[in-house]
Amino acid sequence: MKYAFILFSFIISFSAEAQNGRLLEMKKYFISDSSSGQLMPKEAKEELFQKAVDYYQITYLSDSFRVKGFVAIPQKGENLPCIIFNRGGNGNYNMLTNESFANKLAFLVNSGYIVIASQYRGSYGSEGKDELGGGDVNDVLSLIYTLRSIPKADTSRIGMFGWSRGAINTFLALTKVSKIKAAVVGAGFSNLITLRDTRKLLDTGLYSRQIPNYGKTKDENLLKERSAFFFAEKITKTTPVLLLQGTADKNVPASQALSLAQKFYEVKLPFRLIVYEGGTHSLEQFRSEYQAEVIKWFDNYLLDGKIFPNLEIRN
């Protein structure tokens, strides 16, 4: 009986994993002039309507949970490279909306990329619970398989783009897969311990609320498991990473990116760090500059097939 139960549990687990990424619903939506104009600056609005794009709300499976997300597909072109975007925020906080998804990612879609994003489990309309780098990492990984059902998607060319908390999901995903051709992380959480020391309320707030068992145990290992600074050597070395950081970021101090860059250097992980003097958490003051760097980074590795330079110290 014991072995039968183990076999049954294995079958259930295998079945759930096999379903990961299955696309359940894909519903087209439209960005109206009136709604988007109220939510974005003039230059962003012009960018949004610059080229023809099809926007969709999606529902897909991740660990048997129904998870919501978005996808944007350029109307022109075939066999397009893809970007998985990992949003900031947690649960319902800073969720993507029809307009904000389009606003944040229009610059990539207008450059010929399909962009797909998860709301993460536990957000409004999605099942499960956001664990801030726990099971929700599978919500990101599952999108690799969801892309197989997206029209025009070339799944041999996938990049990943995370912002703020989205850095946790991005870096953890890069410890599990090596098929991501390039990654970009902006204003990223990279050391939850030093971040907690800087923002005291994280300990009793975000960490205790979202990370299973942390509120009761205060076990710092739970924070280290979610901090790229502590698992940098496990991140695939086949994915070059672009780090973007502002020096005036109140939410994520520049020391997070600087110390992570040092760690990446030590483990010989391919990366580039760009620091924007006076840049805040969104880097809105440097919008055009950082977006140009992001496009160039993805173009290099997803379009041009560039190989990262040799990192070995030599003459």
Which residues does each PLM region occupy?
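Short substrate-entry loop that stabilizes the transition state in hydrolases
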Residues: 78-80, 85-128, 192-193
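Mobile cap/lid helix-loop segments that gate and shape the active-site cleft of serine hydrolases
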Residues: 95, 194-234
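Alpha/beta-hydrolase active-site loop
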Residues: 131-151
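Short glycine-enriched nucleophile-adjacent loop
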Residues: 145, 167-178
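Short beta-strand/loop motif that positions the catalytic acidic residue
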Residues: 235, 242-245, 249
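C-terminal catalytic histidine-bearing segment of alpha/beta-hydrolase fold enzymes
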Residues: 258-315
